[in-house]
Amino acid sequence: MNSKLSLSTKLSSSGKTQLAEYFATPPFKVITLPSYDDAWANGLNAMQMSSSPGVLAGDLLEIDISLAKLTALSLNTQAFTRVQAMNEGDSAMQTTHILLAENSRLFYLPHPLVLHKDSVFKQQTQIEMGEQSELIYGEIVAIGRVLNDERFAFRQFSSHLKIYTLKDDGKKRPLVSDCIQWLPSKMNLTALSQMENYSHQGSLTYLNLAKNNAEIKQQVQALQQQSTEEKDLLIGISQLNEYGLMVRVLGCRAEQIQKLFEKIGRLLKSV
């Protein structure tokens, strides 16, 4: 099935963020949620939903998100995404393109991705950021249905994340390039420095084009201090070359990583 979700934001006359354009084909759907107490004043809170039991062989999923100048969007998802079993040679793919205009802000944290036995899933995410825009973007993936004794029973998983800053002349300059490539039949994914005995991996990328390296360093140090309070998680927090930081987490429970990223998101929004 070919499915598409496309949404954009606009600023209302009262200065609040609203949906400008919205288009979705099954199984995608987006609903806006009531306003809430959030550090991003006048932002929009929305939920991405799906009526499908999971991602099936041959699925091509396309997501396009565009934020207008001065708007802020917090986008979450309804439930886990399950990549179902597939016949040999079959696969599914998702492409995500996000465009942040000048001074816009996006928090996007999908629920964890669960890779079922014999599944093949490839995802590509490209994000383009305008001047002084802000991004908090997370990904969480589970190596299988661990309670069903499925550990690395999928065939392949790949995730490519590329983030660029948009210059005045229209050219793009790369800020982040991150790649995960798992082939259980060819890789020892339980080795040291890989997944070891953990079953879930999370990545949270934060970029704020209005902050300098000294300000980002302070945020890294604050997060590193707070991470010592977390139990049963292996957490690494690194400062990027410029404008941001990345958090990597290994754990054994998806919900624990999800809550940690939500907590970090609230902290980053407030500084």
Swiss-Prot record:
Q: Where in the cell is it found?
A: Cytoplasm
Q: Which residues form a coiled coil?
A: none
Q: Does the keyword Chaperone apply?
A: yes
Highest taxon above the source species: Bacteria
Q: Which UniProt keywords apply?
A: Chaperone, Cytoplasm, Nickel insertion
Tell me if Membrane is a UniProt keyword of this record. no
Which molecular function term from Gene Ontology is one that the record holds? nickel cation binding
| Cellular component GO terms, alphabetical | cytoplasm
Entry function: Required for maturation of urease via the functional incorporation of the urease nickel metallocenter.
Complex formation: UreD, UreF and UreG form a complex that acts as a GTP-hydrolysis-dependent molecular chaperone, activating the urease apoprotein by helping to assemble the nickel containing metallocenter of UreC. The UreE protein probably delivers the nickel.
- Return the similarity comment: Belongs to the UreD family.
What is this protein's record name?
A: Urease accessory protein UreD
Organism for this UniProt entry = Haemophilus influenzae (strain 86-028NP)
